[in-house]
Amino acid sequence: MALQIPSLLLSAAVVVLMVLSSPGTEGGDSERHFVFQFKGECYFTNGTQRIRSVDRYIYNREEYLRFDSDVGEYRAVTELGRPDAEYYNKQYLEQTRAELDTVCRHNYEGVETHTSLRRLEQPNVVISLSRTEALNHHNTLVCSVTDFYPAKIKVRWFRNGQEETVGVSSTQLISNGDWTFQVLVMLEMTPRRGEVYTCHVEHPSLKSPITVEWRAQSESARSKMLSGIGGCVLGVIFLGLGLFIRHRSQKGPRGPPPAGLLQ
């Protein structure tokens, strides 16, 4: 699929070439330089769900005319662009409005299969506590959301099923340098026994949100839990060792072959 460019750009370029090649530009003025630039910009939200087109006309590094699809018409940026704005609005307005589809949408659909536009990377979500846990003392929970693409993401905090909006702060979106992003969303809180905090993450790569829970508990409860886990691990190790020894003992010692086989 061939990429499209705004047709009005070709007309403007022809006009500039005609001006620069006219007899008045030769002779004593030949050392002067005139630079005309055109910038066609397409902005996309959620794929092609919302598209914005902006055309910028620049003469000698100064923008003098602009078309913004959100405005719907040409607007002069400087006095130099006023005659062109009036003329283009009369002659080319409908054509330029249509380029939202004929240029922006067309080019998006043509290149998305060959670029990262369709890339989706699911985020990894981890909750951590900024300081050693102590019940009934002020603390901060940190929800680390990493390695996701595209950049659009929504992270919320819940306490016992109710969304928390007070005490929530976030870092700026951080680029990892490999087209993926990360962000930290903090919640200032005072943990109390039995409370459940949830980091809720929504992202285009997910069919359903990711939810990660953190439960407030005392140091003694944490120690008992860790002791229980350690005991279970040791139990599994000793059980496996016992089964291995039993299996070896059931085989019995290997003796010499029957005498008849040696003859």
Curated annotation (Swiss-Prot):
Beta-1: annotated segments: 28-120
Topology term for the membrane: Single-pass type I membrane protein
Transmembrane segment boundaries: 225-245
Glycosylation: residue positions: N46
CDD domains recorded: IgC1_MHC_II_beta_HLA-DQ_I-A (cd21001)
Post-translational modification note: Ubiquitinated in immature dendritic cells leading to down-regulation of MHC class II.
Disulfide bonds: C42-C104, C143-C199
Family matches, as SUPFAM superfamilies: Immunoglobulin, MHC antigen-recognition domain
Gene Ontology process terms (BP): adaptive immune response; antigen processing and presentation; antigen processing and presentation of exogenous peptide antigen via MHC class II; antigen processing and presentation of peptide antigen; immune response
Cytoplasmic side: 246-263
Segments on the Extracellular side according to the record's topology features: 28-224
Protein's UniProt name: H-2 class II histocompatibility antigen, A-S beta chain
Gene (name only): H2-Ab1
